[in-house]
Regions:
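Active-site loop of classical SDR/Rossmann-like NAD(P)-dependent oxidoreductases
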Residues: 98
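ATP-binding N-terminal substructure of ATP-dependent carboxylate-amine bond-forming enzymes
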Residues: 1-95
Length: 98
């Protein structure tokens, strides 16, 4: 399985590191990633708020699961965008409390 991890911090580096230990993972793409993730997976130089560009890379690289690390793309609606494209993702979601 090809997995995409959105973010460029230590959290995303740790996720990539642990995911690579699974025999079910073929390749990991970090969007945009950092120097550390670049050593263990393929970084894709795309801004985390460029949802359309992220989607095109998901399709091009046959990414089957997206993991969203940072809060900013979540607040800006990346989960809604991914749902509309019928893509699998793992992320915290916004909850409305009354």
């Amino acid at each position: 399985m090809n997995i995409g991890v959105i973010g460029s911090g230590g959290r995303e580096h740790s996720l990539c590191f642990k995911l690579l230990q699974s025999k079910k993972v073929d390749k990991i793409f970090c969007i945009p990633g950092n120097a550390g993730t670049g050593e263990i997976c393929k970084n894709l130089d795309i801004d985390i708020l460029e949802f359309k560009k992220i989607y095109l890379s998901i399709k091009k690289e046959n990414i089957e699961l997206i993991i969203v690390g940072p809060e900013i793309p979540l607040v800006q609606g990346i989960t809604d965008f991914l749902e509309k494209k019928i893509l699998k993702y793992l992320a915290l979601v916004k909850m409305h409390l009354n």
